[in-house]
Amino acid sequence: MFYYLYVLKSFKDNKIYIGKTKNLKQRLKNHLRGNVKATKSRIPLKLIYYDVYTNKEQWSKQEKFYKSGIGRDTLKYKL
C-alpha cells in the first residue's frame, strides 16, 4: 500500500495546504470540487508537491514535521 503526503497551493490567497491520503487522485478531486472543508474557501488550488511512502509511521511523522514551523520552511525551500 502507498501513502501520499501532498501540498496544494491556493491561487486565491497564495497559501499552501499540507495533507495526507491513501488515494491521491480521489483526494485531489475532492479538494478541487470544494468537498473538503479546510480548502473549500481557497479554491482554485493546484497540486505543487507530493511524496509517496510505503511506511505508515514515516508518513505520519513526515506530515507532522511539514506542518511544524521548521517543516513549513523546509518545504518552502524545497519548492
Labelled PLM ranges:
Residues 1-36, 43, 50-67, 72, ...:
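GIY-YIG nuclease catalytic motif and its immediate N-terminal context
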